[in-house]
C-alpha cells in the first residue's frame, strides 16, 4: 500500500520503493543512494524541514548497511506534524551515501556517528571523522561481522 508521499513522488517520476507503514502509521520509503541527495532537496522544498533523527544499522552479516532518516513536516497551526521514514541501503564493500548535511544541518553529528560505528562514508560531509571511537581504532564496532579486539587500553582516561 502506498502512502500520500509515495504517490506524490511517483507522479513526479521520482524513483523510490514504498516499504509500507511502521507501527505508528509513518510511511517508510526506500531510496537508492544515487537518488538520495536530489530527493532530499525535493522533500525539503516540499516541506519536510526538520530532520528528527538519522541512524544506521547492519541489515545482516555480510549483507547491506542501511542509513535511516526520520523527517518531519512542521507547519504553523498544524497540531499533528506529517512524518516520513527514508531508508537508503548500501553495499558493505564500498558503503557510500550522499550526505544531506547541506540540506539539514542537524545531520552533522548523526552521520558522523554512523560513519564511526558502521563505516558508511557520507560523500560531501564537511567533517566526516570519528566522533566516539579514537582515531586509531580499527574497524566498525556495530557491524555484525565485527570481531572485537581482545584488549584495548584506554589512555588518559582520568
From Swiss-Prot:
Pfam name, any one: Complex1_30kDa
SUPFAM superfamilies: Nqo5-like
InterPro entries linked: NADH_DH_suC, NADH_quin_OxRdtase_su_C/D-like, NADH_UbQ_OxRdtase_30kDa_su, NADH_UbQ_OxRdtase_CS
Subcellular location: Plastid, Chloroplast thylakoid membrane
GO aspect biological process, one term: photosynthesis, light reaction
Keyword line: Chloroplast, Membrane, NAD, NADP, Plastid, Plastoquinone, Quinone, Thylakoid, Translocase, Transport
EC number, as in UniProt: 7.1.1.-
Membrane topology: Peripheral membrane protein
Main location: plastid
One MF term in the entry's GO annotations: NADH dehydrogenase (ubiquinone) activity
Enzyme class: translocase
GO CC field: chloroplast thylakoid membrane
Organism domain of life: Eukaryota
Reactions listed under catalytic activity: a plastoquinone + NADH + (n+1) H(+)(in) = a plastoquinol + NAD(+) + n H(+)(out); a plastoquinone + NADPH + (n+1) H(+)(in) = a plastoquinol + NADP(+) + n H(+)(out)
Family: Belongs to the complex I 30 kDa subunit family.
Role of this protein: NDH shuttles electrons from NAD(P)H:plastoquinone, via FMN and iron-sulfur (Fe-S) centers, to quinones in the photosynthetic chain and possibly in a chloroplast respiratory chain. The immediate electron acceptor for the enzyme in this species is believed to be plastoquinone. Couples the redox reaction to proton translocation, and thus conserves the redox energy in a proton gradient.
Subunit organization: NDH is composed of at least 16 different subunits, 5 of which are encoded in the nucleus.
Record protein name field: NAD(P)H-quinone oxidoreductase subunit J, chloroplastic
Organism of origin: Olimarabidopsis pumila
